[in-house]
């Protein structure tokens, strides 16, 4: 649904802000943490995934991974900061206004409607404006309650 897509965007953007503060600025553990979320509409409307990745010193990997999981759990327990929600709303509404001038945006809207009968535009502004920290909290909680987490670490050999 449009609301779930918007909630995923709010969650990923809130995590981006939190990880910038905790992992990069406070711990100096990485230049940046990338967060990507996606909802699947095929074959079901009820599948989602959240991908979080970062580079770090191998000696800091465990600590940084723990910080990343703790921050995600904190949002699922307490919700994101109201400031993050407000900044995300402002950003999303501004970006939407800009995207509405682009053919690619409308092609995607038509594609979503054709394949999934999903109207991803008509109520966009109202949905974005209606999102609360509690909504994002419940969304994050539902993701974590799936208890379906995979951790992958890649360590490169130096020759």
Q: What annotation goes with each model-predicted range?
A:
Residues 1-5, 9, 24-130, 148-156:
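M16 family metallopeptidases and their MPP-like homologs
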Residues 21:
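Carboxylate-rich, divalent-cation-coordinating active-site regions
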Residues 129, 133-141:
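Mature hydrolase/peptidase catalytic cores and their serpin-fold inhibitory cores, especially
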Residues 143-146:
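Extracellular/periplasmic catalytic domains that process cell-envelope and extracellular macromolecules
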């Amino acid at each position: 649904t449009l609301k779930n897509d918007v909630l995923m965007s709010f969650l990923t953007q809130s995590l981006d802000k939190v990880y910038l503060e905790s992992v990069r600025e406070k711990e100096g553990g990485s230049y940046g943490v990338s967060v990507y979320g996606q909802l699947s509409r095929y074959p079901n409307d009820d599948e989602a995934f959240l991908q979080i990745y970062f580079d770090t010193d191998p000696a800091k990997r465990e600590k940084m991974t723990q910080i990343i999981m703790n921050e995600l759990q904190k949002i699922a327990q307490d919700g994101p900061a109201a400031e993050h929600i407000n900044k995300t709303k402002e950003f999303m509404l501004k970006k939407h206004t800009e995207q509405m001038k682009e053919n690619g945006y409308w092609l995607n809207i038509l594609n979503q409607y054709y394949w999934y009968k999903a109207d991803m535009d008509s109520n966009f502004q109202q949905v974005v404006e209606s999102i609360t920290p509690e909504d994002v909290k419940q969304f994050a909680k539902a993701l974590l309650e799936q208890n379906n987490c995979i951790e992958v670490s890649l360590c490169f050999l130096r020759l």
